[in-house]
């Protein structure tokens, strides 16, 4: 028998489970997988194999993450479950797991706990726009009023972080009950996935987004002009397209793409993920450099001031051995280049220890093409000491 071919007919969505430790994230992940596999949509992944999440390295940071996949009638899902709280934080901040939406698991027996709050805040910062609440362990709560109280608390907490707390779907159930095949709880997991299908919109595909091509290398071809090469991060580029060259320099330049090459072959169009060389008309060799981006006109602008959510590597991960303080000046590696910047710590934070995550204000010495959701590394002399994501552009 041949292996199954990956079926692209269903739209693909990335989701994950978030919430406080021991509230049942991994049990719910296993239950969803089992319930959908019993319907014949996908193979089940059991609790033990999700819990024994393999170690991955993303930009020098060690993260344990379990990836499972499953299908509903309407969609194909990739589902991320990060076992430990630190893994979850690293996952969100490094962009290792980019989620289109997430299921917030809250134990009805406990209500919202500190990590519930932190995960909601992080979801807001890194741009996970759609959350659905699963009130777990409902089989252990007999008191209807208590359930309503927990639901109200969760909704208030969501509203506090600018999520639509009143409108977010909330389902009460038992992940363990569903995993054990108890019909009333299986039905709740089925209902949860119907809501996930409906509530989380199908994301725009990378190729449908505006062009972004970070420049890695620049060279001139005598008689033809300047070529900039790099990997297309998103969007598409066609011969004849007008583009902008953004970042590093104060002035944004316009150019026209007159040729595209990949592996020494000529293309009419480059797509997200392709490593291409783009021949640019109207640009001198010294007007473009590594670290700039080639973008669809008007789609991205250069900035120096931003707020970032940052994870600082621990000593064991090869990070700093000592804390850093206000006005720390490392390099920020965006796209393809390092730019020096100075760090302002939040009020009341004296210092940041290796292994911490922190919200910082950064001022760069050059403007860089960035937007909310752009990821970066923090480096000292070429060594990565932290990883972050742009939460908000200031100027």
Curated annotation (Swiss-Prot):
PROSITE patterns: G_TR_1 (PS00301), G_TR_2 (PS51722). This is Elongation factor Tu. GO terms for cellular component: cytosol. InterPro entries: EF-Tu_GTP-bd (IPR041709), EF-Tu_GTPase (IPR050055), EFTu-like_2 (IPR004161), EFTU_2 (IPR033720), G_TR_CS (IPR031157), P-loop_NTPase (IPR027417), Small_GTP-bd (IPR005225), T_Tr_GTP-bd_dom (IPR000795). GTP hydrolase that promotes the GTP-dependent binding of aminoacyl-tRNA to the A-site of ribosomes during protein biosynthesis. It is found in: Cytoplasm. Belongs to the TRAFAC class translation factor GTPase superfamily. Classic translation factor GTPase family. EF-Tu/EF-1A subfamily. Its EC number is 3.6.5.3. NCBIfam families: EF-Tu (TIGR00485), PRK00049.1 (NF000766), PRK12735.1 (NF009372), PRK12736.1 (NF009373), small_GTP (TIGR00231). It comes from Lactococcus lactis subsp. lactis (strain IL1403). The keyword Repressor does not apply. SUPFAM superfamilies: EF-Tu/eEF-1alpha/eIF2-gamma C-terminal domain, P-loop containing nucleoside triphosphate hydrolases, Translation proteins.
